[in-house]
């Protein structure tokens, strides 16, 4: 639910490799607060914004920003602001992946329009397990070059 995450949550993921000496590599996924959606005081949002900016700018190991966008509402101001913000602070070695969620809720013409409007996007449905492998591949390709 948008706005429910109010803390930074970390998830360490183990990836299996073909290297006998190093059979696993690890990546940490970080779930950041969706501060644009949260129903909290403006002063708290301002504090989150400062802390988030500092966090993102001071982490040289951050490689990928995955921006989850509700495919039913792809042009929300908050999503445009997030995209602009991340593009402003990201380094040349970092990428942004726009992952459009809940694509199962769109009819075929709506989905086709979304794909035309956002050709670099990845279109996913957790419910129908659509696009999940493509998203995983995009992430692992950037992280590990495979």
Predicted ranges, named:
Residues 14, 68, 124:
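Conserved residues at the C-terminal ends of beta-strands
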Residues 9-15, 26, 89-96, 129-144:
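Structured catalytic cores of enzymes that bind and process phosphorylated ligands/cofactors
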Residues 2-4, 34-36, 72-75, 102-106, ...:
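Conserved nucleotide-binding/hydrolysis micro-motifs of P-loop NTPases
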Residues 1-2, 30, 99, 124:
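Hydrophobic aliphatic residue packing
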Residues 50-120:
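Conserved C-terminal guanine-recognition region of P-loop GTPase G domains, centered on the G4
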Residues 102-146:
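Canonical P-loop GTPase G-domain recognition
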Residues 5-10, 14-27, 33-62, 72-84:
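Switch II of P-loop NTPase G domains
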């Amino acid at each position: 639910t948008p706005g429910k995450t109010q803390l930074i949550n970390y998830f360490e993921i183990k990836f299996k490799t073909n290297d006998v000496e190093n059979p696993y590599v690890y990546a940490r996924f970080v779930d950041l607060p969706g501060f644009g959606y949260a129903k909290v005081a403006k002063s708290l949002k301002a504090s989150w914004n400062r802390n988030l900016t500092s966090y993102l700018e001071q982490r040289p190991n951050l490689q990928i920003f995955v921006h989850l966008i509700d495919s039913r509402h792809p042009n929300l101001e908050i999503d445009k602001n997030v995209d602009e913000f991340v593009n402003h602070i990201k380094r040349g070695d970092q990428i942004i992946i726009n992952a459009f969620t809940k694509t199962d809720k769109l009819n075929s013409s709506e989905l086709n329009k979304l794909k035309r409007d956002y050709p670099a996007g990845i279109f996913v449905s957790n419910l129908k397990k659509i696009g999940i492998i493509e998203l995983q591949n995009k992430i692992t390709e950037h992280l590990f070059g495979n």
